[in-house]
Curated annotation (Swiss-Prot):
Keywords: Cytoplasm, DNA-directed RNA polymerase, Nucleotidyltransferase, Transcription, Transferase. It comes from Methanothrix thermoacetophila (strain DSM 6194 / JCM 14653 / NBRC 101360 / PT) (Methanosaeta thermophila). Its EC number is 2.7.7.6. One of its GO terms (molecular function) is DNA-directed RNA polymerase activity. One of its GO terms (biological process) is transcription by RNA polymerase I. The keyword Hydrolase does not apply. It comes from the Archaea. DNA-dependent RNA polymerase (RNAP) catalyzes the transcription of DNA into RNA using the four ribonucleoside triphosphates as substrates. PROSITE patterns: RNA_POL_K_14KD. This is DNA-directed RNA polymerase subunit Rpo6. The keyword Metal-binding does not apply. It catalyses: RNA(n) + a ribonucleoside 5'-triphosphate = RNA(n+1) + diphosphate. The gene is rpo6.
Length: 60
């Protein structure tokens, strides 16, 4: 994920999906004292460790 540019909609979708995964019991990929899934997902996004990819259509 590092070095890639995401639209604000892609970022929102990625963070939301990751927060849901964390809420449902997925392992947290960073060390943190926070228990809020959204805060954890945002920090993971900032650090570039979220294991989610974005597939885009080729530009025409």
């Amino acid at each position: 994920m590092k070095g890639e540019k995401y639209t604000r909609f892609e970022r929102a979708r990625i963070v939301g999906a990751r927060a849901l995964q964390i809420f449902m019991g997925a392992p947290v990929l960073i060390r943190t004292d926070s228990i809020d899934p959204l805060e954890i997902a945002l920090e993971e996004m900032r650090l570039g460790v979220i294991p989610i990819t974005v597939k885009r259509d080729r530009k025409r």
